[in-house]
Curated annotation (Swiss-Prot):
Name of the protein this chain belongs to: Secreted effector protein PINE1
Signal peptide feature range: 1-21
Listed GO CC annotations: extracellular region
Function in brief: Effector protein required for full virulence. Directly interacts with and functionally inactivates PG-inhibiting proteins (PGIPs). PGIPs are a defense mechanism of infected plants, that inhibit the plant pathogens secreted polygalacturonases (PGs) used to degrade the plant cell wall. Excerts its function by interacting with host PGIPs to negate their polygalacturonase-inhibiting function via enhanced dissociation of PGIPs from PGs.
Places the protein is found: Secreted
Keywords assigned by UniProt, alphabetized: Secreted, Signal
Subunit structure comment from the entry: Interacts with Arabidopsis thaliana PGIP1.
Keyword Cytoplasm (UniProt): no
């Protein structure tokens, strides 16, 4: 019995030291990085880091990932190029200029 009492005290001391050494708040405060799964049918699993939003890919449901926030294109910026659509105009008006080239008006 004498050996088990010091062993129990040591176990309690070791457990309390580990509990104090591991900060719990930091684990909850970490944000999700680009490309990380963030929300599904069961709900959100975290918060995306600054500059990212949690969105599903077009045509996909219940499988959202953190992606960069989409910015609209200002007047005069190219909205369609030879490579295809570049983005959405802030005004909503993408005007044809030449084949495979349109700008925001």
């Amino acid at each position: 019995m004498k050996l088990s009492q010091p062993l129990s005290i040591f176990a309690i001391l070791a457990a309390s030291t580990v509990a104090v050494a591991v900060p719990q708040d930091d684990a909850c405060a970490q944000c999700l990085t680009e490309g990380t799964f963030c929300e599904g049918f069961a709900g959100p699993v975290g918060t995306c880091c600054d500059g990212l939003v949690c969105e599903n890919a077009p045509g996909v449901a219940d499988d959202a990932h953190c992606i960069r926030k989409k910015k609209c294109l200002a007047k005069g910026e190219t909205c369609v190029s030879i490579a295809g659509p570049v983005g959405t105009c802030c005004t909503g008006k993408c005007t044809f200029v030449a084949p495979d080239y349109s700008v925001c008006k």
